[in-house]
């Protein structure tokens, strides 16, 4: 059987890097994404490709690159994200847009980019990394909670939309982790 091909957004550090390293050790073909792969010249765990979840064209390029190299894509792990803290009334509009573009709109665009390939294959899995914060409005983290809650709901809707195509979609909602976000 061919090795499963995995694409992990935010794969250069934190949870994404740990997942990618583990899957590589288990025999998966892993591609991790980062906005600036040139910042990781010594990264050897798996191949890093350029992808900014806030840039739809870079998403298309990265997904096309993986598919052109592997002729398939079996698993997407939507992991890239940013944190934001502060009182809602004092959070600048630009920061609100940034957290929604990164934590919600970006993963949606990545899912839209991989779904045609998965549908064509008749199989695939999408795992969205949400957060326990998406199940409750945490004080001083309201916008972060909102983005993760929205991603959880779109995951639920898309799971029902794609169930007849052989594509499974779920989310994983970790608690606090010491990462660089």
Task: Map each language-model feature to its residues.
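The beta1-alpha1 cofactor-binding region of Rossmann-like NAD(H)/NADP(H)-dependent oxidoreductases
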Residues: 51-61, 93-94
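N-terminal Rossmann NAD(P)H-binding glycine-rich loop of SDR-like oxidoreductase domains
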Residues: 12, 16, 20
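A short, exposed helix-loop element centered on a Lys and neighboring polar residues
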Residues: 111-112, 156
């Amino acid at each position: 059987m061919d090795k499963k091909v995995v694409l992990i957004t935010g794969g250069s550090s934190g949870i994404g890097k740990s997942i990618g390293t583990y899957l590589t050790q288990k025999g998966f073909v892993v591609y991790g994404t980062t906005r600036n792969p040139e910042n990781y010249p010594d990264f050897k765990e798996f191949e890093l490709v350029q992808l900014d979840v806030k840039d739809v064209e870079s998403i298309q390029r990265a997904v096309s690159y993986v598919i052109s190299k592997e002729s398939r894509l079996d698993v997407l792990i939507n992991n890239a994200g940013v944190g934001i803290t502060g009182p809602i009334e004092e959070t600048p509009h630009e920061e609100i847009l940034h957290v929604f573009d990164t934590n919600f709109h970006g993963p949606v665009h990545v899912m839209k980019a991989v779904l045609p390939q998965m549908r064509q294959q008749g199989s695939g899995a999408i795992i969205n990394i949400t957060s326990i914060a998406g199940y409750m409005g945490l004080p001083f983290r309201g916008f972060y909670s909102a983005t993760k809650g929205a991603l959880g709901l779109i995951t639920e809707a898309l799971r029902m939309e794609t169930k007849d195509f052989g594509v499974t979609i779920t989310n994983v909602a970790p608690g606090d982790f010491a990462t660089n976000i």
